[in-house]
Amino acid sequence: KVYQANGVPRCLGLALTNLSACIHLFIMSLMLYVAAPLVFNAKTPENPGAYFFCLAVYMAVSLGVASVIGLAVKDPAKTPMLSIAVFLPSTILSGIMFPTALLPKGLAILGRMFPAFWGYGIMTDSTCQPEKLLPLLAMFILAVFACILLLGKTDT
């Protein structure tokens, strides 16, 4: 709304918001990448180049989904609630918080519909396997098309 009030095109507002979020997420990821081995005695990825590529792919998909939510929900007070409704189950059902083997089969299958499942899978592998990137690519393409459609709609 602030961008519209000042005459800034919605697509520029979307691009700037995503750029800012991407920079912040990357800085946080770098901090965790450095701190995790020191604080938690975690292993560093065997192939840092593949790890950061997979991180960039996962961030792009997550920001795409967040962009769809931001463009689709007209009431700013409802946007965080819908984001929580999408991203919290994504985290819970992906295997990040606990192994998916502990979930009932139906919930484990449902978890595969969320980006976090595939993002976690590619980031924990030592190599970035193309067959694990395809679902994320499909989600990203769907998010881009949804954003294009939502940007094309006029506000009423």
Language-model features, listed with the residues they occupy:
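Transmembrane helix-loop junction
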Residues: 37, 70-71, 75, 95, ...
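Hydrophobic alpha-helical transmembrane segments of multi-pass membrane transport/permease proteins
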Residues: 25-29, 83-91, 138-146
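A residue-level signal for alpha-helical anchor/packing sites in multi-pass solute transporters
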Residues: 2, 33-34, 68, 118, ...
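Junction motif at the cytosolic side of a transmembrane helix
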Residues: 38, 127, 135-156
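Short hydrophobic, aromatic-rich alpha-helical segments embedded in or entering the lipid bilayer
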Residues: 99-134
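Short helix-to-coil transition segments within interhelical loops
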Residues: 2-10
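Alpha-helical transmembrane segments and their short interhelical loops
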Residues: 10-81, 88, 130-133
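Transmembrane helix segments
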Residues: 73-113
